C-alpha cells in the first residue's frame, strides 16, 4: 500500500508545479498581445512603402534597371537565415524550425550548392555549433518583442554578404504564425529581391488574443490592402527614380525581416502558452488521480486499524 505521506508530498509538489505553469501561461498570453500590437503598429509604414515601391517599379518598367539587390546571379553559395528562440518550454517550436533548416541544407548539398548559416536565437546557435556547421554570424539574447534596430543589424550583415558576392542567395527560415495552436516553419527568399513580389503578396491577417468563457481564443481579421496605384506620368522626381528605388530596397528588406522576427516571436509565445496550458491540465488530472489514490490508501489504513481492534477484542474474549 502506498505511503500516505509520500502521496501527500507528491500532491503538494504537483500543485506547486501547476502554479508555475499557470503563471507562465498568463505571462506568455500577455506577451502575445504585445507582439500583436507591434505587428499592427508597423503595418501602415510597410503598406505605404510597398505602394511607393510599386509606383517606382511601374514607372521604370520600360527602363533597364540594374540594381545589385534585384539581379539574379549564378547559384554557387546560399545563406540560410534561421530564426529560433532563446529558451525552451515552447513545445516543438524550436525543433520544427531546426528540422526545416536541416532539410533545406541537405537539399542544397544534394544539388552540389554550398551553404552557410546566419543564426538568430540561442537554440539554433547551440544546435548547429555542436554539429560543426558553417556559420557566418550569430545573434542571441534578442528582445522577446523584436525591435527595428535588431532587424537592421541582421539585415546589414545579410546585405554585406550578398553585395560582396560571398553568397548569391539569401533564404529566411522562420515560423509563420497561423493560429494559437498552429504554426508552420517556412522558407522565404530574401535576396535577391523580386520587384513583382513586392506587391503581389498574400493577403495580410491580424490575430488578436481574446478570452471567451474563461478560455483564451484567437480572433483573426483579414486586412484588405488597397489597390496599388501607378504614379502619374508627369510626376517630377528631384532624384533619379532608380536612385530612389536603390535607397528604398534595403529599407524594404529591413521591414520584411522585422515582420518575420515579430511573427516568430508571436509563434514562440503562443507555443509556450499552449505548452503551459497543457502542462496545467495534465497537473490537474494528476492531482485528481493522486487524491483518489490517497483517499483509497487512507480508507485501507483505517479499515486495517478497525480489523486489528476487532481482532484484539475477539482475542480477549
UniProtKB/Swiss-Prot annotation:
Location in or out of the cell: Cellular thylakoid membrane
Keywords from the named record: ATP synthesis, CF(1), Hydrogen ion transport, Ion transport, Membrane, Thylakoid, Transport
Superkingdom per UniProt: Bacteria
S-S bonds: none
PROSITE patterns from the UniProt entry: ATPASE_GAMMA
GO terms for cellular component: plasma membrane-derived thylakoid membrane; proton-transporting ATP synthase complex
CDD domains to which the protein is assigned, alphabetical: F1-ATPase_gamma
Membrane topology: Peripheral membrane protein
Gene Ontology molecular function, alphabetical: ATP binding; proton-transporting ATP synthase activity, rotational mechanism
Family, as annotated: Belongs to the ATPase gamma chain family.
Binding partners and assembly: F-type ATPases have 2 components, CF(1) - the catalytic core - and CF(0) - the membrane proton channel. CF(1) has five subunits: alpha(3), beta(3), gamma(1), delta(1), epsilon(1). CF(0) has three main subunits: a, b and c.
Function: Produces ATP from ADP in the presence of a proton gradient across the membrane. The gamma chain is believed to be important in regulating ATPase activity and the flow of protons through the CF(0) complex.
Protein name, entry field: ATP synthase gamma chain
Species of origin: Acaryochloris marina (strain MBIC 11017)
Amino acid at each position: 500500500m502506498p505511503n500516505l505521506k509520500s502521496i501527500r508530498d507528491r500532491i503538494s509538489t504537483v500543485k506547486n508545479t501547476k502554479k508555475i505553469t499557470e503563471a507562465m501561461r498568463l505571462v506568455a498570453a500577455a506577451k502575445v498581445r504585445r507582439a500583436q500590437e507591434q505587428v499592427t503598429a508597423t503595418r501602415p509604414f510597410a503598406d505605404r512603402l510597398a505602394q511607393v515601391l510599386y509606383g517606382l517599379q511601374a514607372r521604370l518598367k520600360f527602363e533597364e534597371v540594374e540594381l545589385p539587390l534585384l539581379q539574379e546571379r549564378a547559384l554557387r553559395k546560399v545563406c540560410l537565415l534561421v530564426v529560433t528562440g532563446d529558451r525552451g518550454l515552447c513545445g516543438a517550436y524550436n525543433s520544427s524550425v531546426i528540422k526545416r533548416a536541416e532539410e533545406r541544407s541537405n537539399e542544397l548539398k544534394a544539388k552540389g550548392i554550398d551553404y552557410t548559416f546566419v543564426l538568430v536565437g540561442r537554440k539554433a546557435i547551440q544546435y548547429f555549433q555542436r554539429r560543426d556547421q558553417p556559420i557566418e554570424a550569430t545573434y542571441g539574447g534578442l528582445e522577446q518583442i523584436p525591435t527595428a534596430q535588431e532587424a537592421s543589424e541582421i539585415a546589414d550583415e545579410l546585405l554585406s554578404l550578398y553585395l560582396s558576392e560571398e553568397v548569391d542567395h539569401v533564404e529566411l527560415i522562420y515560423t509563420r504564425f497561423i493560429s494559437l495552436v498552429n504554426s508552420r516553419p517556412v522558407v522565404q527568399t530574401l535576396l535577391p529581391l523580386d520587384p513583382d513580389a513586392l506587391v503581389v503578396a498574400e493577403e495580410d491577417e491580424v490575430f488578436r488574443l481574446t478570452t471567451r468563457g474563461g478560455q483564451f481564443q484567437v480572433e483573426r481579421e483579414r486586412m484588405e490592402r488597397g489597390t496599388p496605384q501607378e504614379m502619374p506620368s508627369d510626376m517630377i522626381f528631384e532624384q533619379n527614380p532608380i536612385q530612389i528605388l536603390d535607397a528604398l530596397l534595403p529599407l524594404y528588406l529591413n521591414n520584411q525581416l522585422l515582420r518575420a522576427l515579430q511573427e516568430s516571436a508571436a509563434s514562440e509565445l503562443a507555443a509556450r502558452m499552449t505548452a503551459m496550458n497543457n502542462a496545467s491540465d495534465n497537473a490537474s488530472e494528476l492531482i485528481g488521480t493522486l487524491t483518489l489514490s490517497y483517499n483509497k490508501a487512507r480508507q485501507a489504513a483505517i479499515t486495517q486499524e478497525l480489523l486489528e481492534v476487532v481482532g484484539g477484542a475477539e482475542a480477549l474474549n
